[in-house]
Amino acid sequence: LVELDVDALITGFKDLLLSLEQDRKLAGKFAGILHITNDSIADVVQSDRTELLYGQEYFYEELLGLKFKISTFSFFQTNSYSAEVLYQTARDYVGDLGGSDKTVFDLYSGTGTIAQLMAPAAGKVIGVEIVEEAVEAAKKNAAANGLDNCEFIAGDVLKVLDEVEEK
């Protein structure tokens, strides 16, 4: 099942967005259509207002056997096929870390994708991310994937590392 998510960062055109779901070739493939309003000058995706026009505010993506719930403002690789190659290469490079005495750190972890993909090779994985919503998503995704050796901490990486016991 291929799910599509349309996040339009525009100032109008809601009718056009809704017409996408009515297109016969695309009908039934959208997890959600959101209208994101941002009238400020910015080089990042930010929202002055987000309106759900259709469906839900998230979609699911599967990478290397793990399933991730992705929302509009989650950090997630946009090219999933390339991400799988990259992450598989990283897993192959790391290999088996020798069991329960090894800890992997995923710094600036976002929604914890890399941490979760490394979890089977390590005794423990610690992800650190400053965006609290991303940390909550990482915790939920890890639980949904049955990974009990992942810990995600919300905070500034430089400050959190001073406080972490596993170094």
Regions found by a protein language model. Name each.
Residues L1-K167:
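Accessory RNA-recognition modules of RNA-modification enzymes
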